[in-house]
Amino acid sequence: ILLISVFSLIGKGEICSNKFGSTKEIEEEFNKTWNRLVPKGIPFKSMYTTPFWHLASEPFWNVYTSDGSSVDDIWHKPIMSIKRQRKELSAIIDFNLYNIILDNEIRSAIIAHLESIVRKGLNL
């Protein structure tokens, strides 16, 4: 859901680089997407901070501190407050992926595919 949210914000021009901070806009888009895709009663909580960290294990997503340092396992705390995360963290997605996502047709197809994966994962 976080990828869908980030890709949507890229499409809206609200994320204009492959490097971006953990922002209120991303959180709001995540919550909007969550509410649209995840039915009420599902035992998961809408917290964009969790996938922000989990995506760090993917080769196309890197998490950095505000001073540009890579986040290591000791500092890696997925439960950090949203306020602290907004202040201290940035993500960088692969430059080639970012350029692909700029294409409206490709972005729409990828978002549709990711949404179908979410629905399948929730058995909808």
Predicted feature locations:
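Intrinsically disordered, charged low-complexity linkers and terminal tails
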Residues: 1-124
